[in-house]
Amino acid sequence: MSIIEAIIIGIVQGITEFLPISSTAHIVITQFLFDYTFPGFGFEIFLHIASILAVILYFRKDLLQVIVGFFSYFKDKSEENRIQFMFAIYIIVATGITGVLGLLLEDLVGAQMKTPPFIAGALIITGTFLIIIERFFVYKDRTVKDMTLKDSIIVGLGQTLAVFPGISRSGATLITALFSGLNKETAVRYSFLLSIPVILGTSVLAIGDLLDGTLVEQVGGLPLIISFIVTFFFSWLGIIWLIDFLKRSKLIYFAFYCFALAIFVFFYFDHNMTIDLE
């Protein structure tokens, strides 16, 4: 991998990771555009780790609050500790549902789903649900203290859909969290914190390739480092921008983007093209 390719991939991954527009779809589209062969699934997960590092650092206070509250609840049954304890449980439940269903659906998601028509269709589905949640759904004002087990199950099921290329993980979790009645601030926080165990869980698949030198051999030491740093930097910017954007604007603008990108993907690329990230 060249330095330029490492920078481009890092920028695309970082910017799109947490926006409701599917980072995997954009990585695949980038490969279509530049006729570039992706190093493998291990490299994709390696970049996800950079994105998650940005989340951990940005939400470090929230994360610490949840962890401390979770363990403190065993000794101190205060209301604040109870809220944080239950929030941790809701993260665990949603993650568990996603993990189990993700494994069951693993064999279903093959190279045939990494084609322009499938990705375009998935982007249209994402855009459609973004419009539905904005135009036909009345926002409620439930916060973390109002969450229930039902909310975590709904969001966990929604997050599972992200195994399909073109379905955004952040989009799926935001939509289902809002649908369950959580306010925007709580939905965004829940979505970001949920990404940590999900992506760290899949990152074990890349550790072997990294330790035995496979990733370094496939990508190159310097491009690997550069892609990681660039991904981290643009993920950090993406987090800041998305949180600020959602305070001022609506998810429907992402829907318009998904529709435009779907049209471009469907009509610009050969429908027989496939890219397997495995």
UniProtKB/Swiss-Prot annotation:
Membrane-topology descriptor: Multi-pass membrane protein
GO MF term list: undecaprenyl-diphosphatase activity
EC number: 3.6.1.27
Note in the entry: Bacitracin is thought to be involved in the inhibition of peptidoglycan synthesis by sequestering undecaprenyl diphosphate, thereby reducing the pool of lipid carrier available.
GO terms for cellular component: plasma membrane
Function description: Catalyzes the dephosphorylation of undecaprenyl diphosphate (UPP). Confers resistance to bacitracin.
Enzyme class name: hydrolase
Gene from which this protein is expressed: uppP2
Organism from which the protein derives: Halalkalibacterium halodurans (strain ATCC BAA-125 / DSM 18197 / FERM 7344 / JCM 9153 / C-125) (Bacillus halodurans)
InterPro entries to which the protein is assigned, alphabetical: UppP (IPR003824)
Keywords annotated in UniProt: Antibiotic resistance, Cell membrane, Cell shape, Cell wall biogenesis/degradation, Hydrolase, Membrane, Peptidoglycan synthesis, Transmembrane, Transmembrane helix
Name of the protein this chain belongs to: Undecaprenyl-diphosphatase 2
TM annotation in the entry: 1-21, 38-58, 85-105, 118-138, 191-211, 223-243, 251-271
Intracellular or extracellular location(s): Cell membrane
